[in-house]
């Protein structure tokens, strides 16, 4: 009789699950229940991620509106700058027609100006720019010998500097507009879809905890975008990877398009609050390029200053009037060029902000998409618990902790040590949270 009772007890024990080192092992049914609870948490995190995606999308749209406003200001400043530059060029041409006047006086002063200008410039270069003084000295000698005092007298260096600056500004603007237009075409197609406009975000159409047939409500099946992400009958179950991968690909493409040239713009904006004449880096660059930077130092040489003050009105009264007109238009052109630089710098910053937001969008969405990419079967669990061990069943697990092995979709197994008992109501929430954190961390490292 005792033997019979013992056998009955053993059978009952086996039906309730095997015992290991005094602890009852987790049954398959309990593992399924834990997987269901963990999957609900992952589903909630996916919904939160999509809500954040929409918030970032709103910020991108706001940044784009600010960019449009800046673009309008840039176009206005560009028009004024070009008008002033045209006036400057026209007046310069007229002045060149009378450059023979006072030529003897200017040439005498120029011969005394050149040695001082060369010495002053080379001292500056050796002290500030340092590299390649010998080559620069030879280049400067040729530049001064080929230049005329008339070029000096009409501030030809300032005119040339403006023209070069205008060329670079146009080049920079072309680069930024090309990058933005490439990204904008992708973002327009991405954001115009009702997936991003539905309120509130609802992931039930791909959730294993609800009907999947609601997916068709989010897309216009006639659009190219819808055809790309719905290569299957309209009312069939949606595949997680097919749903998300196109979004991730488009966001990634938009970010790449924006960053293609934006961070390699070959132009240094003038530093805010720093006078142009004290911008040593720009002066060094000009001196190395064609020696015109040396003409910035003309005020340090007496004979050079005298050339600038030569009055030829006795020979031709209209010449001094033209020179004054040139000076006025030159000042206006420099003023609008500086304004354009400031607006261009703000525009670039706005573009960088958009690029940064696209990066956030990419990072926020990528983990969802990458998880979806791992899904190769119809398993209804986002998170699947495969093993659970405590100290009683596995002596290597410290007392009071629980060792859990899980899989997110079809990902690699993730081993977690949880500072809670299985009986804790928050146990699976902690497991799911830790699993997602580990997955995101590994994704970033890869």
Curated annotation (Swiss-Prot):
Keyword Signal applies: yes
Coiled-coil intervals: none
Pfam family, one: Clusterin
Entry PTM: Proteolytically cleaved on its way through the secretory system, probably within the Golgi lumen. Proteolytic cleavage is not necessary for its chaperone activity. All non-secreted forms are not proteolytically cleaved. Chaperone activity of uncleaved forms is dependent on a non-reducing environment. Polyubiquitinated, leading to proteasomal degradation. Under cellular stress, the intracellular level of cleaved form is reduced due to proteasomal degradation.
Compartments, as annotated in UniProt: Secreted; Nucleus; Cytoplasm; Mitochondrion membrane
SMART domains cross-referenced by the UniProt entry: CLa, CLb
Motif mapping: Nuclear localization signal: 78-81, 440-444
Chaperone recorded as keyword: yes
Modified residues (Phosphoserine): 133
Single GO MF descriptor: unfolded protein binding
S-S pairs: 102-312, 113-304, 116-301, 121-294, 129-284
One cellular component (GO) term of this entry: cytosol
Glycosylation sites: 86, 103, 145, 290, 316, 353, 373
Subunit relationships: Antiparallel disulfide-linked heterodimer of an alpha chain and a beta chain. Self-associates and forms higher oligomers. Interacts with a broad range of misfolded proteins, including APP, APOC2 and LYZ. Slightly acidic pH promotes interaction with misfolded proteins. Forms high-molecular weight oligomers upon interaction with misfolded proteins. Interacts with APOA1, LRP2, CLUAP1 and PON1. Interacts with the complement membrane attack complex. Interacts (via alpha chain) with XRCC6.
Similarity field: Belongs to the clusterin family.
Record-given protein name: Clusterin
Chain's gene name: CLU
